[in-house]
Amino acid sequence: MLAPHAAGLAAGWTEDGGGVEVRTFRYAPERYEVLGYGRTLESDERVRGGAAAMTPLYGLGLHRAVRRLLARERFDLVHAHWIVPNGVIAAAAVGTTPLAIGLHGSDVFLAEKPGVRVLARRTLARSRLLTGCSPELVDRVRALGFPAERSRVIPYGVDVATFAPDPARRGIWRERLGVPDGAPLLLGVGRMATKKGFQVLLETLPGLLAARPDAHVVLAGAGDLFDRFTVLSAQWPGRLHLPGKVLRDTLPDLFRAADLFVLPAVHDAKGNVDGLPNVILEAMASGLPVVASGISGIPLAVEDGATGRLVPEKDPGKLLAALLELVGDPGRARAMGERGRGKAETELTWDAVAARYREGYELALSMPG
């Protein structure tokens, strides 16, 4: 794996990477190495000025690193994740080595922009395989010019051991947040960005708390909308909890504290959308029923009526009805969570996902060069 430098990244993955060797590259002094997720996009909609200024340096650094690596070692295939910028840069650097492109969400939004589209098309012309975590993302990029027979929709995986239910740890986060043992706790996790749809969830709170005044809602994460949500939370003191960014090693216990997971994802005003949020898979592995929007790659994981409820995006009325349905029937909610856990264990483990990638790689390598 080749990745841009981030403090502790290579050391952490090498330690428990399961045989994956991690190489990193530098492209600027550490304080300026800001490309990636919240540090690159403002609310996942606009490129921040500082990040835009670093993009040429990032491109040069990645190009040099790929060329250097391929000169020293032989690789059967290069799989560049995010068509923009990594796929574009890799296509210019790999020479005759076969190339695959992986799609994740914001990269597709960028690839469709008029000034970038021509680069994306050239990258696709150089690629043998296209993978994506949702049918929508794959279809949107195929529309730029890529054959369906060489496209694969492959969901993300989840570590079902790390996120296993553990009733003995259910009270850790409840005590920290001041949520009583028997109170319904609805959990959302993710960056505070428009496409996560938390603003839609907040629209349901008056109705939710009128029907269930004992309910608590926890939205965990940081981002550009956090301050706005903090101001709004004053309307529901002691009922809407915003703990901010949660450390990765404490996240499983936060899921264990919850009764229901909610992520009402949306297409934002510019068409940007998540592929398949990892937190949905983590919630399923934790044995939680999931209420989410039925868009993008989410229906690959959540089965409406079986492992949770899928609702139309940007529809607070339908979202509220689904939340009240499950909060009002704890037995049914638990059964949905158990089925979700079973699906995670059988279909969404990393071994299952790796097998699907392996099939795609074999297809790519069987093509004439």
Give the location of each predicted region.
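A short helix/loop element that forms part of the nucleotide-sugar donor recognition site in Leloir-type
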Residues: 14, 164-179
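Acidic donor-binding loop of glycosyltransferase active sites
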Residues: 256-273, 288
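A short, well-ordered alpha-helix in the C-terminal region of glycosyltransferases
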Residues: 318, 325, 332-347, 356-359, ...
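Conserved donor-binding/catalytic core segment of Leloir-type glycosyltransferases
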Residues: 131, 180-196, 202-206
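Nucleotide-activated donor-binding/catalytic signature segment of Leloir-type glycosyltransferases, i.e.
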Residues: 227-250
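Conserved acidic donor-binding segment of nucleotide-sugar-dependent glycosyltransferases
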Residues: 301-305, 309-316, 325-331
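Short hydrophobic beta-strand element within catalytic cores of glycosyltransferases
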Residues: 280, 285, 289-292, 302
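Carbohydrate-associated surface elements
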Residues: 5, 136, 157
